[in-house]
């Protein structure tokens, strides 16, 4: 049997024949998906480091600035003892720090583990990560933090504020009202806790080579996802998985001489769909990511 339009001989196995390709333009039928790291992919797609990568409440972050923050974060992760094969619990909304941590983890050969759930389920994720450090939003309550410390190996919390990387004067009143509503319980800073800026400062004197050997098939991002099959399950993604997903969508975005933007509203929890389909994809297509 010969497939119409492509002339390919059919085997009867959809995974081999890929019959859907007959409906694609010829130029796209045999596109090869690159097996590269997320950072290599984004750099290739955004060679001009003076171009804006993110807009966040009045602050424009260029690619040069973004890579600089990644460098700081990677060094600080090494100071905290993270390295290859380690898992880093990261429970953040879609704020700039999340994307910085993703690439920083990739550089040192680690993986970030993300979850948005009840405190007990977050504790489970920390225990499975076997990590003494977790990254959380700074409105995490004292009772939740106490639970983390009592039931997991966690000894240190890095607290990220919604205002980190924002121009506070540019934040609309309705957004400030929403942010304020997140601080519902008692909040306490325990000895050893750090702000995001304090975390970045940890590695300022780090001079060793922190880069792990580049491996696109190494796990870099894990997210607990659920649906109709019961409790949330951890799904691990390698750099090449993420690149493949973003690449196959980005090829449909034509180049533009005019800076185009991709709006990600309500700062949703940074799980897999948000991170890859709603962020890495538009960034790889050369769009400016507006986090709002």
Indicate residue ranges for each PLM-predicted region.
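AMP-dependent adenylate-forming
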Residues: 14-22, 39-62
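Conserved structural elements of the adenylate-forming
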Residues: 67-72, 200-206, 235-256
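Conserved AMP-binding/adenylate-forming core of the ANL superfamily
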Residues: 33, 52-81, 86-95, 99-103, ...
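Conserved pre-ATP/AMP-binding loop-to-beta segment of ANL
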Residues: 159, 177, 181-224, 231, ...
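Conserved AMP-binding A3 loop
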Residues: 62-64, 188, 220-246
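Conserved AMP-binding/adenylation subdomain of ANL enzymes
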Residues: 109, 243-262, 269-292
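Short beta-strand->loop structural element characteristic of the AMP-binding/adenylate-forming
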Residues: 89-91, 98, 102, 106-137, ...
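Conserved ATP-dependent adenylate/AMP-binding module captured primarily in the ANL superfamily
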Residues: 117-151, 243-264
């Amino acid at each position: 049997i010969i497939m119409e339009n492509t002339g390919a001989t059919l085997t009867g196995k959809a995974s081999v024949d890929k019959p859907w390709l007959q409906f694609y333009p010829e130029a796209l039928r045999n596109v090869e998906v690159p097996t590269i790291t997320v950072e290599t992919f984004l750099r290739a797609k955004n060679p001009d480091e003076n171009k804006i990568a993110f807009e966040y409440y009045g602050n424009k972050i260029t690619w040069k600035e973004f890579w600089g923050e990644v460098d700081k974060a990677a060094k600080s992760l090494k100071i905290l003892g993270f390295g290859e094969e380690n898992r880093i619990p990261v429970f953040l909304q879609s704020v700039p720090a999340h994307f910085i941590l993703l690439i920083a983890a990739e550089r040192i050969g680690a993986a970030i583990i993300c979850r948005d759930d009840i405190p007990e389920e977050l504790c489970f994720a920390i225990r499975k990560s076997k990590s003494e450090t977790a990254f959380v939003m700074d409105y995490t309550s004292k009772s939740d933090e106490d639970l983390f410390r009592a039931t997991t190996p966690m000894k240190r919390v890095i607290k990220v504020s919604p205002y980190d990387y924002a121009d506070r004067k540019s934040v609309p009143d309705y957004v400030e009202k929403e942010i304020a509503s997140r601080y519902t319980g008692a909040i306490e800073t325990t000895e050893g806790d750090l702000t995001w800026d304090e975390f970045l400062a940890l590695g300022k004197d780090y001079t060793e080579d922190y880069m792990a050997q580049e491996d696109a098939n190494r796990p870099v991002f894990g997210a607990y996802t659920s649906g109709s099959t019961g409790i949330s399950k951890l799904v691990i993604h390698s750099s090449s998985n993420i690149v493949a997903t973003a690449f196959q969508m980005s090829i449909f975005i034509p180049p533009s001489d005019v800076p185009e933007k991709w709006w990600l509203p309500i700062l949703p929890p940074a799980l897999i769909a948000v991170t890859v389909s709603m962020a890495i994809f538009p960034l790889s297509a050369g769009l400016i990511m507006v986090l709002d």
